[in-house]
Amino acid sequence: MLNVLIFGAPGSGKGTQSEELIRRYGFRHISTGELLRAEIKAQTELGQAAAGYINEGHLVPDSLIVDMMEKLISTLVDTEGIIFDGFPRTIPQAEAMETMLAHHGWKVDIVLNLQVPEEMLIERLLNRGKISGRSDDNIETIRKRLDVYANETAPLVDFFTRKNVLHNVVGTGTIEEIALRIAPIVDKFRKVSN
């Protein structure tokens, strides 16, 4: 099984490229954002706790995310690969993830770091907010989310670089152009793991 992390700032195209990987390889997609939005919509205890953080542009605390992911990961055994989108977002989450995966005899194989200029991220997020109606896609919250990313999540680049699994990918261009930059990376690791 191949474990792939899609990494990048809000608006970098993580969800879109995850969909491309699912289509191309049949991987299972785990998006913490989608899981949290579902919890919020269902008004679960986790959803109510997470909503306050998300609406303010803050990261949901590690303990809530790790518990949610641990439950989900334990159900995924017969799959070609897993795409983690939005997890981990902090060093403690990354360390917890390594422990969770190791418990199943797995590891992080590839980290795809989608790199997009900030002005393009803002434009993409504002457009997405108009289309989707997501309340967290307004300029004030976007800037706060980008600051949180720079301060709390970007340090993971160094963390995964030291583990020799990080691959920087230019995240500009068409969806297909970006997917074509990612495919050779994934193909190389699929050959090694088969």
Swiss-Prot record:
GO terms for cellular component: cytoplasm. Residues 31-60 are annotated as: NMP. Residues 127-137 are annotated as: LID. GO terms for molecular function: adenylate kinase activity; ATP binding. The keyword Cytoplasm applies. ATP binds at residues 11-16, 128, 173. Pathway: Purine metabolism; AMP biosynthesis via salvage pathway; AMP from ADP: step 1/1. AMP binds at residues 32, 37, 58-60, 86-89, 93, 134, 145. Pfam families: ADK. InterPro entries: Adenylat/UMP-CMP_kin, Adenylat_kinase_CS, P-loop_NTPase. Its main location: cytoplasm. Keywords: ATP-binding, Cytoplasm, Kinase, Nucleotide biosynthesis, Nucleotide-binding, Transferase. It catalyses: AMP + ATP = 2 ADP. It is found in: Cytoplasm. GO terms for biological process: AMP salvage. The keyword Nucleotide-binding applies. Belongs to the adenylate kinase family. Consists of three domains, a large central CORE domain and two small peripheral domains, NMPbind and LID, which undergo movements during catalysis. The LID domain closes over the site of phosphoryl transfer upon ATP binding. Assembling and dissambling the active center during each catalytic cycle provides an effective means to prevent ATP hydrolysis. HAMAP family: Adenylate_kinase_Adk. Monomer. This is Adenylate kinase.
